[in-house]
Amino acid sequence: MVSRPAMSPVSPVWPRKPNLWAFWVLRLVLLLSLKSWAEDTLQHCTWLLVLNKFEKVGLHLSKDRFQDHEPIDTVAKVFQKLTDSPIDPSENYLSFPYYLQINFSCPGQNSEELARKGHLMGMKPMVRINYMYSVNFYRWEMENLQILMEAAPMRSTGYCPAEAMCILNWYTPMPFKNGSVVSSVDIYTNGIGPFIPKKRFYVNMNGFLKRDASGKSLFAIGYESLVLKSSHFRLSKSRPLWYTVNHAPVFILGGFYDEKAILFSDSNFQDYVLLELSIDSCWVGSFYCPILGFSATIHDAIATESTLFIRQNQLVYYFTGTYSTLFDKSHGSSRWVRVLPSECIKRLCPVYFSGNGSEYVLALTTGKNEGYIHIGTITDGLVSFEMVPDGWSVCEKLPGKNCSIDWATYITDERNLLLLVKIDSGQFYLVNFNTEFKTLNILYKIPEFIPEAKELDFLVLLDTVTYTNTPMTPKGLFFNTLNNMLYIWGNFILQSYNREEFIFLADFPKESTIKYMVNSFKGQMAVVTENEEIWYFLEGGYDVYQVVPSQGWRTYLKLQKMQKSPLYSTNESLVSLFYQDENLFQLVYLFDVGKERLVKRLLPVGTLMEYNLPKPFTVVNQGNYKMITFTNTCPFKAIHAVDVPKKQHASRTESYVALPPLVSESLGFHNNNTLAVYQGLVYYLLWLHSKYDKPYADPVHDPTWRWWQHKTKDKDYFFYLFSNRLAAEGIYINMNAYQKLYNMSGDYGIPDLFFLDKGNWFTFTVVLLSHQDTFTSSDSQGPTINVDKKLSLSLVLADPECLSVTATREFLLNRNTLLTKIKVIDKKRCSEQGMVGRNIKKTSMLIKVLGAPGNCIQRTYLGDHIQGIRLVPIFIGCPPGKRLAFDVSYTIKHSEEINKHYFDCVIKDAEMPCFLFRDLFQPFFLVQDLVTGDSGSFLGSYVLKVVGGGRTLNTIRDYTEEEIFRYNSPLDTTNSLIWKTKVERTTEDKKFYIMSHESPGVEWLCLENSPCYDIIPQSIYPPEFFFKLLVSNRGVDNSTYCDYKLTFIVHIHGLPLSSKRSSFIVMVSTSFFIALVVFYILFCLVWPHIVKAWVSFRWKIHNMMAPETYSSSSSSGGFTLHSHSSEGSFEGPSRPGTKEDNVQAKRAKVA
């Protein structure tokens, strides 16, 4: 839980008086009245939640369905106005199409007034949304994700007499993520205001809607009935609710007499609609199909993650929803599809757990293919059926000529089909068929009669058992994958740990016949009989309790009627019974005249069992008085767990927090623009999470780190603008309010789920506080030696070959306390290496206090809970939230140490540093834990391959398998290796090297036939190449169950040229240099002669032009000058600029 500082109202200044007794009395009265008010409203106030479309936010009575599954572009204009904020307006901010509208109500009080009062007191609803991962881990990586948000208050649109009197609601965005269609919403307060218990809602995607031409939403699977008639329920008995556990976004329930209608809900029956299905209802009965009559009733209905299945008569239909977050829209159905048209299907059986990335449904045949079974597989919305066994019938392996498969259940992890088979003599067999190896085994021959078990809670069925005259009538099977418990039920209950030896539960009467079973998969089970009785028992125990009808039920019903509860009536009919989050719920139709309605209500098993418990007492004399002393039925006074791993870490849940931006409005109310900003920020936060897959390890492996990396230094400036009402749009975005949480507080208690990697372990301590007489006896003044008989804790492992457990006990006599420290360790045997979510072994540990089940009830303000027994699910395999990353920082540091230098590229790239070709390259990797925030060096073994490359980032191409072998394998003989190493360890086939953090490193080769051979420089810088490397530890690492696979790019510079090209360049360069030297020498020798010739040539030209210049002068003067010039010409030319030249020039001027 994330807490924020809240403003406290200023206390009034009370005048000082010598005596303040009156004040303290008044204060005490006020506190007592507040306490009584809190206790009175604690269990009655409840949260209200509806879904609003983006454009309908602010409409008080608006309610929408989760039909749109893609983000919308509606907030970009708002973000462009946020100039003075830490966000980058140039980023593309999208939004989700829905908001969550939150409010609460308290019986007998004005809800609108309560909401305004709570807001003014500082109450803020906190919303935590948990996303369920997809069953197809091949397409979507298994991850547990949750986001914590704070709801923003907003006045509803419409008329209100005064601003402070407007209807108030709280809003948060309703984000969704790819690979998830099921999301739970937990709502609770920040601890201020009225007491409202935390409540969970399911807001699931609905892929079975369509829009008509006007844009109105309609159901694609049928026609919605606006009226739910009582006649729909008077002639119909209760029926089971079948669905894939934790993954079905919608629930469907058939069974309406002679009507092709179903109840449909996308909120776990928080609301619902009645749909008349649009199916053809063809009658194809024949002599292959021994069905006597036709009925429109939908007999079986099963919901999976994406597909709905129904059976009407002998026909089976399916409809695949349109879920763009799971698969392509083209996989969705436009109408009901009939499958197995030539088969006569007598029953559909559910498969509660997925396996191998798919879901399953079982169809039992009758008629011509009696003895066969059809297994339906659903993968990405695509449905296929396979008939097994192939080529032979189950009946051929059993005594007699004919047989009938009455029930089937599929163990997906083992690929085993458990079949309840009846032969023509009436004998029932439990048969196992393995779909992988196509083998069939008879596991157990079910007794023909009910065993004799007078005054016993249970009976182990051995050969010495005596039987009554009441025949056993098996009706079905139930298998719990978590604890390997198998149940055969009918007018009896048989349970088995190993599917071969069975225990008869004697508390269930043979006069009743079970109609269906429901399981919480947390250790509790309930059964409904043909007479609508409800029986309850705890797995791992042997006691079966009747809760409806019972004395406790009659007492509870009277109390509810006295309180005028609207959920109970004297005339009602049970529709279905199902578990939700360990709580047992009834779907009941109430036949109150004028108020007929269908309600979902909690069946308080703990309260009913407490009312049913005997109240033993004794009368003792105390002086002159007699006192009644009640005997404790529970062996302990209190129980709790300490030193427990954090639930977030144990269940491997990644958590984010997103709080609304602060607004400058005086009362703190938001508007459409501020909520749009909230939408965009939440979308961007989850977008960063989905895109965070950097192969290079960041200094902080947090998706939000780069978001605010360069903005945090200005946070005081942004707050200054906001506090002075200078911020754009009056909004302040707190950067610390959008981040990842690694250590959530407030999640105490034993986690609901543990993930264990190879060889990992976890510990916690169970504290049992005993009654005063546990450690002492009447004949002993000190501690008794028989404490174990009064207070003892047992641990039961569902798969002891997979896990080991140790329990260390410590007695604290002075505190009457027993401490039991429990440590569970993985034995490294029951799971194989694989990607996240694959090869997960589902198992559990049962913690049980001796004598506690059924006798220990804890009373809380949320109801009564059964104590002393707890099933702890444990998943063995690669846990979610771990990734491998290239530790480039340490690789550079280590490269500098071993090579005594490090040369980066001339043009540096901080995101992708360079490595020199001639240096030894030794990569290091980090295992980053995205749940805890920890990271550490990967110390396991791995195989490194160059799987692609190119001269630039844009020209990188992936190599073929043949090329990968030639470029990386030590067995290559084509002179194509890119690199080599001195490591001697190789894979079993000798094809590739096996490396580790202790390996000597990689030496780059780039031989003649490799793609990096003889790279021509494109500029003055040396040649460079980009290598695409693949690192995988699959099959070579024994330190983890995780199959790490990392692909990253390494930039190598300074690649050498080939010998031919080098020789050619040397020859050309040498020749050019020699030519240049020769030219220089020749130039130095010839240049003086060239200069002398030029001067002589110039002088001659000058002399030739001189007579023409002076031809216009006087004859005497010209003759004299000419004569003088003629004489001087015999002396040879003088150097320019000499003294003689100057004298001659002066003479010529005078003349």
From Swiss-Prot:
Transmembrane segments: 1064-1084
Stated family: Belongs to the CATSPERG family.
Signal peptide bounds: 1-38
Positions of disulphide bridges: none
Record's bilayer topology term: Single-pass type I membrane protein
Keyword annotations from UniProtKB, A to Z: Glycoprotein, Membrane, Signal, Transmembrane, Transmembrane helix
Subcellular location: Membrane
Glycosylation sites: N356
Positions on the Cytoplasmic side per record topology: 1085-1151
One Pfam family it belongs to: CATSPERG_Ig-like
Gene Ontology cellular component list: CatSper complex; sperm principal piece
Sequence ranges of Low complexity compositional bias: 1113-1123
Protein name stated in the entry: Cation channel sperm-associated protein subunit gamma 1
Extracellular topological domain: 39-1063
